[in-house]
Amino acid sequence: MWFKNLLIYRLTQDVPFDAEALETALATKPARACASQEVATYGFVAPFGKGEDAPLVHISQDFLLIAARKEERILPGSVVRDALKEKVDEIEAEQMRKVYKKERDQLKDEIIQAFLPRAFIRRSATFAAIAPRQGLILVNASSPKRAEDLLSTLREVIGSLPVRPLTVKVSPSATMTDWVKTQKAADNFFVLDECELRDTHEDGGIVRCKRQDLTSDEIQLHLNTGKVVTQLSLAWQDKLSFVLDDKMVVKRLKFEDLLQDQAEQDGGEEALGQLDASFTLMMLTFGEFLPELFEALGGEEIPQGI
């Protein structure tokens, strides 16, 4: 269990996450299949294992792991539009009258309801790790919408979840721009070979660089003409690499072989043991990595009144 992306949320109050109570709460909203006329469903699933006996909360040391699954029927807009046009054309030709918006909308709804039972179904899972002692919830997603779906559903079942996206005192873009300009990152961080540069003016240009020497004159010229770094590939110690963006989203997390080998050794031969060992080692690594990342970005910002 290695996260590939990271959206970081700060608990603004102490929340007593009791694993047994959380298990009971999540069980009130389990994931389920879409009924024939349902567009989507959302609920909690076991992060590890399958079957009714698999726990909805995985506990390892002081960390909790939960997962939610979305099931949705995929109905392409083009299919609906084509069917609607065909129906409207048929009515207008046969009845020699114009089909106006209200009737068109009603026809569209009827077409959707007729097509839904035959639509393809897509399933997607989102994982979140809760670190109560650190006051953090870490969501394995790069889309804030996907993370908010999980957090809002968690809030729904436990009654209250005082949480906000974690922010830092210095703009990540300003810090990353400085690192590339000075060709030196913060301690334990190393600039790699990929970045995105954007012009600060509205409708300004975007430059995306991959497998490129970011110390080159070409990159420096872009920075000197006013562009700023909005995405940057980085490494931390010899343990992980990632891409950081200007919204404080950590993407394309990759844990180095040394960590993965250690988890494999710790986990034994059973699949569940391997998953537990990798999750534990990942969370312990985050316990070192995240405070250093926050410090490198000027320190965590604590909004007034919190």
UniProtKB/Swiss-Prot annotation:
Superkingdom of the source species: Bacteria
Any one GO cellular component localisation term in the record: cytoplasm
Keyword Metal-binding: no
Molecular functions (GO terms): double-stranded DNA binding
UniProt record, GO biological process: DNA recombination; regulation of DNA recombination
General function of this protein: May be involved in recombination.
Protein's name according to its UniProt entry: Recombination-associated protein RdgC
Name of encoding gene: rdgC
